[in-house]
Every structure is written in structure tokens, then in C-alpha cells.
């Protein structure tokens, strides 16, 4: 709702991607298993047993902790068109080849072929797209 008030003309809108939840200066790799001096991905579980992907950026010694579910707005075409963004972004960070192809195919179906898609077969979030920010 805030997006429609602010306007999205000339802006880019993320319609798919895992968002960073936190950037941490305390190295998860170093704290848990010792520093490997190599950038890569780790998995961290919270108290509810949700798995978070953590990218450790070894050269600068920080971590990016990603949300457990990606933001997916691909099926919100009408609302997106009303906002009139200049560009749409699909941000791939944690995906394997199969998921990347799946999301590109969904984008093509909805935005290029004008098709409707059914329910998505994986966990996702809308972020603040429907709720707004309070």
C-alpha cells in the first residue's frame, strides 16, 4: 500500500529472491568450526529448527544471514502493473539450477506469455508487499 502512495515509476521492484535478514561482523564459521579462510555458505538453525543460509565473506570477515523463505511476487502481476515499476528483478543467491530455471519459467509464463499460475509448491513470503510497514 505504501508503494502505491510513494509510486514506483523509475524504480526497480524485487519479485523474487532471498533477502538478507542480518549482516554480522562475528564470523559464524570461525566461532563454530574454526576459520577456513574461504568464502562460502553455511547453515544455521534457530530455536524453532528453521534453517538459515549464511554466506561468510572471508576477506572482510562478515556474514550475511538470509531469510529462510524467498520473497515471491511473480503471481501478483495485477498489483505490480498498477505500481508501474521501471524494471523487475529476480535475485538469485542460494538457488540451485533447478529452482533458478523454475523461477525464470514462472516469470516468463506470467509476464511474457500472460498466463496464470497456480499455487507455488514451496514456502515463500510476500515480505511487506501485502502487509505494509508499521
Where do the model's predicted regions map?
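Active-site pocket-lining/capping segments in soluble small-molecule metabolic enzymes
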Residues: 1-134
Amino acid at each position: 500500500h505504501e508503494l502505491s502512495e510513494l509510486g514506483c515509476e523509475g524504480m526497480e521492484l524485487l519479485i523474487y529472491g532471498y533477502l538478507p535478514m542480518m549482516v554480522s561482523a562475528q564470523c559464524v564459521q570461525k566461532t563454530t568450526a574454526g576459520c577456513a579462510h574461504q568464502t562460502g555458505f553455511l547453515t544455521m538453525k534457530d530455536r524453532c529448527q528453521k534453517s538459515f543460509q549464511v554466506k561468510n565473506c572471508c576477506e572482510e570477515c562478515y556474514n550475511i544471514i538470509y531469510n529462510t523463505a524467498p520473497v515471491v511476487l511473480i503471481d501478483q502481476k495485477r498489483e505490480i502493473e498498477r505500481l508501474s515499476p521501471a524494471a523487475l528483478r529476480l535475485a538469485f543467491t542460494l538457488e540451485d539450477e533447478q529452482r533458478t530455471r523454475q523461477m525464470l519459467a514462472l516469470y516468463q509464463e506470467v509476464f511474457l506469455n500472460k498466463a496464470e499460475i497456480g499455487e507455488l509448491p514451496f514456502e515463500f513470503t510476500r515480505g511487506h508487499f501485502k502487509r505494509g510497514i508499521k
